[in-house]
Amino acid sequence: MRLTSGIFHAAIAVAAVGAVLPEGPSSSKTHRNEYARRMLGSSFGIPKNQTFDYLVIGGGTAGLTIATRLAEQGVGSVAVIEAGGFYELNNGNLSQIPAQDAFYVGTDLDDWQPGIDWGFHTTPQAGAYDRVSHYARGKCLGGSSARNYMAYQRGTKAAHQRWADTVGDSSYTWEQFLPFFEKSLHFTPANDALRGANASVVSDPSVLGNGDGPLSVTYPHYAQAFATWAKHAFIEIGLQIRSGFQSGALLGQSYGLYTINATTMHRESSETSFLRKGLADPNLTVFQSALAKRIRFQDKRAVGVDVETMGRAYTLSARKEIVLSAGAFQSPQLLMVSGVGPAATLKAHNIPLVADRPGVGQNMQDHIIYAPSYRVNVITQSALLNEEFEAQANRDYNERAAGIYANPTSDILAWEKIPEPKRSAWFSNHTRQVLAEYPDDWPEVEFLTMGGYFGYQRNYIRDNPSDGYNYASLAVSLCTPRSRGNVTITSPDAGVPPVINPNWLTDPVDVELAVAAFKRTRDFFNTTAIKPILIGPEYFPGSQVATDAEILDHVRKSFDTIFHASCTCAMGLANDTQAVVDSKARVIGVEALRVVDASALPFLPPGHPQSTLYALAEKIACEISGNC
């Protein structure tokens, strides 16, 4: 799209943060005077040796949440160490506009943007014919909440019971964890007048908090026409309409709730929500463009972090604790280069051993995604390639915070267990037995209606057909991943990228489910409800992909991750040698160090983990401060 006025507004918004800080008497907790508090720069650190009460490594989804809450809850001074900067400034407005969420996330190694992304790539993947893929990760304030697809939904009640059982802590049950979900939120109901016809939303606001949280969640001011037809097709194949996916149940379909600012329709991230709030607190300091290189220990107590900013090395020290929130790849990497991890790995790189934790970097879990695409006779995001349509969409977004740019491409989310009799026909006895181990409310497959073309997912923008047709897709994601990957290091230097091996689609259960899920998309497109809007047969991959072997071949060539890497510093019981943190997120075997991000999850819950990470950060902040 053309650059809208959004980037100018973003720059002004960032630059003006200091000007809107609350006035009042100077805090007794700080020596800053009131005039200094009104300057943006007062909230940001400069590269030199300093000491704070708490250090948070990583300014991403969980990192900015826990840092802001700790400062707010009066624990003392808090510093955030973030390698990136403001995505609004480093990526134009592409990171702000919901419809632009597919920029720089393809599997091609050159489909990345160094201003906001780490440029990580995987090892050759056996489950994808040895393909090496770019794995998008947010290198910016907001982290991957600035890069994701903005879906906000929660796991199931039984998944939370399994979490509580796995870590031996009842505070992770649905009933006890729900308040931490609610604490973050500022929910705004759907604006049906702007969404358009036949797109009304059924939701349950009773579980969406009291509205005083900083994180805006709402429904886009535009609904894709494809979705209005898709909901009837879902009903035809057995997926009934639910009142949203926030109440601990997922089986069925609903319009998705998204982390979008309800007024501007800009992306909402931990930076636009928690950090903007936190900058008003004189006890919060942010070090941007600051790469954490190593955690320092005295005996087994974490006491500081070696940091590098633009070639300058310095140390930030912690009086009380350090919270590691660098994500599923770099949290285990930082632990290992600091001496916490598998002893053999550390020895191979001459890293002094602080604690032998074999599970560091292991147990990686992730969700994959792929989709067939059809030509359709309704407007989708394909129409943005038409200059006249795009110009009107631009005006709608800038002038009314509405129109197709307000929509993040996906609309309806739906979950199911593969139903009978297809289940018995499609699955081996082994696969049926393994899937039976999951709770009754845990779905096996997620469907996402997508108003656009999917293809091989190498570069969504480059590969988008420009033939004048509108395209729509039904994406599928596997919710019971059995394949396990790992993360390791090749150097004691945290500046050297970690080795990332997701090991996708290598377990036979995942393989059978991947084929079955693709067949279910064809069930969907064969319904009488969806037929009226289809132009011709399946466009991608096409009817020549027919047998199970051909479907699997296609899936291996076309799938990508939906960027839910997790569990590489898994939570568990202290006597579990594969566990890295306990139920309070404390690293086992050392003191004054916690891990709070997706790497700390004991397993990957069904769906999109963003909501869980915000809630986990809220929970651990309360554990630390004791002031909730």
Curated annotation (Swiss-Prot):
<keyword id="KW-0560">Oxidoreductase</keyword>
<dbReference type="GO" id="GO:0031012">
    <property type="term" value="C:extracellular matrix"/>
</dbReference>
<feature type="binding site">
    <location>
        <begin position="82"/>
        <end position="83"/>
    </location>
    <ligand>
        <name>FAD</name>
    </ligand>
</feature>
<dbReference type="GO" id="GO:0016491">
    <property type="term" value="F:oxidoreductase activity"/>
</dbReference>
<feature type="glycosylation site" description="N-linked (GlcNAc...) asparagine">
    <location>
        <position position="261"/>
    </location>
</feature>
<dbReference type="Pfam" id="PF00732">
    <property type="entry name" value="GMC_oxred_N"/>
</dbReference>
<dbReference type="GO" id="GO:0005576">
    <property type="term" value="C:extracellular region"/>
</dbReference>
<feature type="glycosylation site" description="N-linked (GlcNAc...) asparagine">
    <location>
        <position position="198"/>
    </location>
</feature>
<dbReference type="InterPro" id="IPR012132">
    <property type="entry name" value="GMC_OxRdtase"/>
</dbReference>
<feature type="glycosylation site" description="N-linked (GlcNAc...) asparagine">
    <location>
        <position position="93"/>
    </location>
</feature>
<feature type="binding site">
    <location>
        <begin position="609"/>
        <end position="610"/>
    </location>
    <ligand>
        <name>FAD</name>
    </ligand>
</feature>
<dbReference type="InterPro" id="IPR036188">
    <property type="entry name" value="FAD/NAD-bd_sf"/>
</dbReference>
<keyword id="KW-0732">Signal</keyword>
<keyword id="KW-0325">Glycoprotein</keyword>
<dbReference type="GO" id="GO:0005773">
    <property type="term" value="C:vacuole"/>
</dbReference>
<dbReference type="Pfam" id="PF05199">
    <property type="entry name" value="GMC_oxred_C"/>
</dbReference>
<keyword id="KW-0963">Cytoplasm</keyword>
<dbReference type="GO" id="GO:0050660">
    <property type="term" value="F:flavin adenine dinucleotide binding"/>
</dbReference>
<feature type="binding site">
    <location>
        <begin position="148"/>
        <end position="151"/>
    </location>
    <ligand>
        <name>FAD</name>
    </ligand>
</feature>
<keyword id="KW-0926">Vacuole</keyword>
<feature type="glycosylation site" description="N-linked (GlcNAc...) asparagine">
    <location>
        <position position="429"/>
    </location>
</feature>
<dbReference type="InterPro" id="IPR000172">
    <property type="entry name" value="GMC_OxRdtase_N"/>
</dbReference>
<dbReference type="GO" id="GO:0005938">
    <property type="term" value="C:cell cortex"/>
</dbReference>
<comment type="pathway">
    <text>Mycotoxin biosynthesis; patulin biosynthesis.</text>
</comment>
<feature type="active site" description="Proton acceptor">
    <location>
        <position position="564"/>
    </location>
</feature>
<keyword id="KW-0964">Secreted</keyword>
<comment type="similarity">
    <text>Belongs to the GMC oxidoreductase family.</text>
</comment>
<feature type="glycosylation site" description="N-linked (GlcNAc...) asparagine">
    <location>
        <position position="283"/>
    </location>
</feature>
<dbReference type="InterPro" id="IPR007867">
    <property type="entry name" value="GMC_OxRtase_C"/>
</dbReference>
<feature type="glycosylation site" description="N-linked (GlcNAc...) asparagine">
    <location>
        <position position="486"/>
    </location>
</feature>
<feature type="glycosylation site" description="N-linked (GlcNAc...) asparagine">
    <location>
        <position position="49"/>
    </location>
</feature>
<feature type="glycosylation site" description="N-linked (GlcNAc...) asparagine">
    <location>
        <position position="575"/>
    </location>
</feature>
<feature type="signal peptide">
    <location>
        <begin position="1"/>
        <end position="19"/>
    </location>
</feature>
<dbReference type="GO" id="GO:0140723">
    <property type="term" value="P:patulin biosynthetic process"/>
</dbReference>
<keyword id="KW-0134">Cell wall</keyword>
<dbReference type="GO" id="GO:0016218">
    <property type="term" value="F:polyketide synthase activity"/>
</dbReference>
<keyword id="KW-0274">FAD</keyword>
<dbReference type="GO" id="GO:0016614">
    <property type="term" value="F:oxidoreductase activity, acting on CH-OH group of donors"/>
</dbReference>
<feature type="binding site">
    <location>
        <begin position="61"/>
        <end position="62"/>
    </location>
    <ligand>
        <name>FAD</name>
    </ligand>
</feature>
<comment type="function">
    <text>Patulin synthase; part of the gene cluster that mediates the biosynthesis of patulin, an acetate-derived tetraketide mycotoxin produced by several fungal species that shows antimicrobial properties against several bacteria. PatE catalyzes the last step of the pathway which is the conversion of E-ascladiol to patulin. The pathway begins with the synthesis of 6-methylsalicylic acid by the polyketide synthase (PKS) patK via condensation of acetate and malonate units.</text>
</comment>
<protein>
    <recommendedName>
        <fullName>Patulin synthase</fullName>
        <ecNumber>1.1.-.-</ecNumber>
    </recommendedName>
</protein>
<keyword id="KW-0285">Flavoprotein</keyword>
